[in-house]
């Protein structure tokens, strides 16, 4: 395979990756923590869009526990979206023998 062909493949992959990345960043992902006790919607660019807390969890005496659950749910949602992004990038990049 010629260097020119490889360079063109890389440019095409870069364009395709950029296009898919922009679409991914605007996509909303819903994450349900503990069977929907806390629902988090996060965008692909990791912007937190919404948090919905089951009213059963809202009790002033359990404030610390609720805060810990929100942090854990948010971190799990971010991790999930990062994994989906990594999978998207991996699928987009071309497989050039001997290059990577």
Curated annotation (Swiss-Prot):
GO molecular function terms attached to this record: DNA binding
Record's signal peptide: none
Protein name: Uncharacterized protein MG134
SUPFAM superfamilies (UniProt xref): YbaB-like (SSF82607)
A Pfam family this chain is assigned to: YbaB_DNA_bd
Source organism superkingdom: Bacteria
